[in-house]
């Protein structure tokens, strides 16, 4: 579960390393984001000479959460960290590579580009 002020790792090569969630999108009463939800983030750590800079405000999609997620077949999936992939203005990923596994729930949300770039889909 991701909420406002949660620090997430970045799972792509956009140049950002750590981001801070400043808003969960999806309605005025939506407090928590889980896998596949879009959030508004600000970049807290970035590598020099990259596509994104420290202080940039962007959208991102959550690809891994430490909180377990229940699937319809009664299995549970959880990861060691909270991670997100940075999105551009058109909703496409900013980076060209994805690091680490991503959850299968992204396919239902329509993030097929992220699914195809990921090395492993759990």
Curated annotation (Swiss-Prot):
In Swiss-Prot or TrEMBL terms, this protein is called Large ribosomal subunit protein uL14
Q: Which GO terms describe its biological process?
A: translation
Q: Which family does it belong to?
A: Belongs to the universal ribosomal protein uL14 family.
Protein task: Binds to 23S rRNA. Forms part of two intersubunit bridges in the 70S ribosome.
Molecular function GO terms recorded: large ribosomal subunit rRNA binding; structural constituent of ribosome
HAMAP family the record matches: Ribosomal_uL14
Read off the Gene3D superfamilies from this record: Ribosomal protein L14
Segments traversing the membrane: none
Q: Which GO terms describe its cellular component?
A: cytosolic large ribosomal subunit
* Tagged with keyword Iron: no
- The gene name on file is rplN
List the keywords (alphabetical): Ribonucleoprotein, Ribosomal protein, RNA-binding, rRNA-binding
InterPro entries associated with the record: Ribosomal_uL14, Ribosomal_uL14_bac-type, Ribosomal_uL14_sf
- Annotated coiled-coil positions are none
What does the subunit comment say? Part of the 50S ribosomal subunit. Forms a cluster with proteins L3 and L19. In the 70S ribosome, L14 and L19 interact and together make contacts with the 16S rRNA in bridges B5 and B8.
Q: Does the keyword RNA-binding apply?
A: yes
Leader sequence range is: none
């Amino acid at each position: 579960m991701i909420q406002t002020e949660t620090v997430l790792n970045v799972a792509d090569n956009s140049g950002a390393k750590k981001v801070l969630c400043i808003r969960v999108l999806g309605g005025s009463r939506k407090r928590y984001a889980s896998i596949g939800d879009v959030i508004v983030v600000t970049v807290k750590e970035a590598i020099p000479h990259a596509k994104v800079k420290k202080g940039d405000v962007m959208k991102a999609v959550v690809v891994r959460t430490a909180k377990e997620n229940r699937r319809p077949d009664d299995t549970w999936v959880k990861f060691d960290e909270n991670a997100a992939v940075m999105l551009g203005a058109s909703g496409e990923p900013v980076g060209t590579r994805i690091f680490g596994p991503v959850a299968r729930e992204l396919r239902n949300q329509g993030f097929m580009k992220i699914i195809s770039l990921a090395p492993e889909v759990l």
